[in-house]
Design a protein with these regions (language model features):
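Positively charged n-region of N-terminal signal peptides that target proteins for export
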Residues: 1-4, 20
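Sec-dependent N-terminal signal peptides
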Residues: 4-13
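Single-residue recognition of alpha-helix boundary sites
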Residues: 13-14, 228
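Sec/Tat signal peptide C-region and signal peptidase I cleavage site
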Residues: 15-19
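Beta-rich carbohydrate-recognition modules and glycan-binding surfaces
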Residues: 20-240
Length: 240
């Protein structure tokens, strides 16, 4: 009987751990950082990678060189954002980056916009479609918070075939309003949000050879726009 109880307990713990792992790549935006009784969660487009030259790439010239350009194409399983239904919004390109390695090592390369991209509201998740060519490299999203502080979050390994939507949750800020990723100020209702400053790939040194290709499409965010939609229109703007 005692042995049976121990086995049951181990299985329950294992199931709980598995359930937590399953949320890493598909977090529920409605359950992340609930700080108010009301939320207005919306999926918004951050960038569709439709403008040549807006995204660039770089890596140390000692380790290799990069080339970035647009290609016609799209993930077959990509869905349209509900608010964009019926709108004539261009969405025919994907962003491709080629890396030519000069030597093996613990390298990384960055894909970044020519100017940072702000996200309105309190961001819950960030997602992007990626074709990673089944390498053990790791993708990170790079952001700045309300105070301009830099953070990076792993979106996962690129060891899959074809297109996959990769998602990461942005951790809610602690109650002190100082530490962690701060997305706004409790003293006023303007300028809430974080800013996307780039994507970085950390290279597996065992696969840092020859040429490597990676493609991106449809950078999105799930964000709470309740404060943005309910602030007073006659409120004064600070910062003068």
């Amino acid at each position: 009987m005692k042995k049976f109880l121990i086995i049951t307990l181990v299985l329950c713990i294992g199931f709980a751990a598995f359930a937590q792992q399953g949320e890493i790549g598909n977090p529920d935006a409605t359950r992340i950082g609930i700080e108010t009784a009301q939320q207005m969660i919306r999926e918004v487009s951050v960038d569709k990678f439709e403008h040549e030259g807006f995204w660039r790439s770089r890596m140390s010239s000692d380790n290799g060189y990069t080339t970035t350009r647009l290609f016609l194409g799209a993930p077959a399983n990509k869905s349209v954002i509900a608010e964009e239904e019926g709108m004539d919004i261009p969405d025919i390109y994907v962003l491709g980056t080629r890396i030519d390695f000069l030597r093996r090592g613990h390298h990384s390369f960055t894909i970044y916009p020519v100017r940072p991209i702000p996200i309105e509201g309190i961001t819950k998740t960030i997602s992007v479609w990626v074709a990673g060519r089944n390498f053990n490299h790791e993708l990170f999203v790079l952001i700045e918070d309300f105070y301009g502080r830099y953070y990076e979050f792993s979106m996962g390994k690129l060891n899959f075939i074809g297109w996959q939507r990769m998602t990461v949750a942005i951790p809610p800020a602690p109650e002190d309003g100082i530490s962690g990723v701060i997305q706004g100020s409790r003293h006023h209702h303007g300028n809430f949000g974080i800013t996307i400053v780039g994507l970085r790939v950390n290279v597996d040194p065992m696969e840092a050879r020859g040429s490597y290709y990676i493609y991106f499409d449809d950078l999105r965010a799930e964000t709470d726009l309740f404060t943005e939609h309910h602030r007073d229109a006659d409120d004064m703007a600070d910062g003068w």
